[in-house]
Amino acid sequence: MKFSGLFPFLLLALGTLALWAVEGAENEALKAGACPPRKSAQCFGNEKPRCSSDWQCPHKKKCCLDTCGTECLDPVNITNPVKKKPGTCPVIHGQCLMLKPLNHCETDDQCIGALKCCKAMCGKVCLSPVKA
């Protein structure tokens, strides 16, 4: 039985992808908590994002959406039961092309006003609820 000359390269590529997936899964399990509620302030310019992933943040800090962009913030504990806001999340169609999209919220209480924390195309975001 003959193997193609591409077979070793295929094995190398699959091995690299497997390691990358396992490493990402381990990292994902390490950062606990959720981003704190966003401050309701106005942004007066476009700030450069300070992070795009929790793993760019030191220690237990998480990469969170803040007033004018993203920054590393101390997480809040989400083990306490949280009141859900009324209404349901809108149905989102499509598929995210990002490997690890950033969640801008984890629970409804992290969203201002009547907004709810809903699954969007890429990660969770605060959205206006749909009236039932």
Swiss-Prot record:
This protein's UniProt keywords: Antibiotic, Antimicrobial, Disulfide bond, Glycoprotein, Immunity, Innate immunity, Protease inhibitor, Repeat, Secreted, Serine protease inhibitor, Signal
Species this protein is from: Ovis aries (Sheep)
GO annotation terms (biological process): antibacterial humoral response; immune response; innate immune response; response to lipopolysaccharide
Protein name: Antileukoproteinase
Signal sequence extent: 1-24
Cellular component annotations (GO), alphabetically ordered: extracellular space
Expression induction or repression: Up-regulated in response to bacterial lipopolysaccharide (LPS) in bronchoalveolar fluid (at protein level).
Function (record text): Acid-stable proteinase inhibitor with strong affinities for trypsin, chymotrypsin, elastase, and cathepsin G. Modulates the inflammatory and immune responses after bacterial infection, and after infection by the intracellular parasite L.major. Down-regulates responses to bacterial lipopolysaccharide (LPS). Plays a role in regulating the activation of NF-kappa-B and inflammatory responses. Has antimicrobial activity against mycobacteria, but not against salmonella. Contributes to normal resistance against infection by M.tuberculosis. Required for normal resistance to infection by L.major.
Tissue specificity annotation: Detected in bronchoalveolar fluid (at protein level). Detected in large and small intestine, trachea, skin, lung and tongue.
Keyword Transport: no
Subunit: Interacts with GRN; interaction protects progranulin from proteolysis.
Subcellular locations according to the entry: Secreted
Record flagged with keyword Oxidoreductase: no
Pfam families attached to this UniProt entry: WAP (PF00095)
